[in-house]
Amino acid sequence: MVAYILFDSALHALIREEVRPAVKPDGINMHFLVNNCSQLQSVFYEAMRLTKRDIGIRKVVRPTLLGRKLLSSGNAVILATCQLHENRDIFGHNIHEFDSNRFLKRPDLSRSSSFKPFGGGRTYCPGRVFAMQEIFSFIAFLFHRWDIELAFTAGKDKTSDGKQTFPVADDSTITLGITRPLPGQDV
């Protein structure tokens, strides 16, 4: 999420301004962050949509026809959530691009059956609200208390003007959470 914000200077400025009222000398106003920072929330959901590459496992409880395939009772079905998050019918034609406004323009997307960053059913993450609040407070402190920007150095993984290139995600494996960048691709 930090990388997506840092690589877009307009978004960086917008997030800094949006979270500013939540950062107080004695701490964070979490209520403000959760209820008044719609751009931050949209960035959070979009980052989760693009980087969450885990699986959901369900047991087939009765014979079920899926397309032309019969799933027998007792078998397990494994579903990669990243495929749900790449549904063009739900998320639009630019599914592989980070769109910081995707969930701002369509708040209903966060409740879509194709958006499962925290699992679902009995495996719905009980810590999802806490995790979101921790991430929001980290972002608020990071961008409010310090003037953070990308380093400009020549070398590998840099553009011709010395800017760091966006980290490439390691999409080669399913994870238990967020996809890591390829080795050497950290921000």
Predicted regions and their residues:
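Central I-helix of cytochrome P450 enzymes
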Residues: 1-21, 78, 127, 135
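Cytochrome P450 heme-binding "Cys pocket" and the immediately downstream C-terminal segment
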Residues: 11, 128-174
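Conserved cytochrome P450 K-helix E-x-x-R motif and the immediately C-terminal K′/meander segment
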Residues: 21-69, 109
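Conserved cytochrome P450 K-helix/beta-meander segment immediately N-terminal to the heme-binding cysteine loop
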Residues: 79-107
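Active-site-adjacent bridging/hinge elements
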Residues: 106-117
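C-terminal helix/juxtamembrane-tail motif
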Residues: 168, 172-187
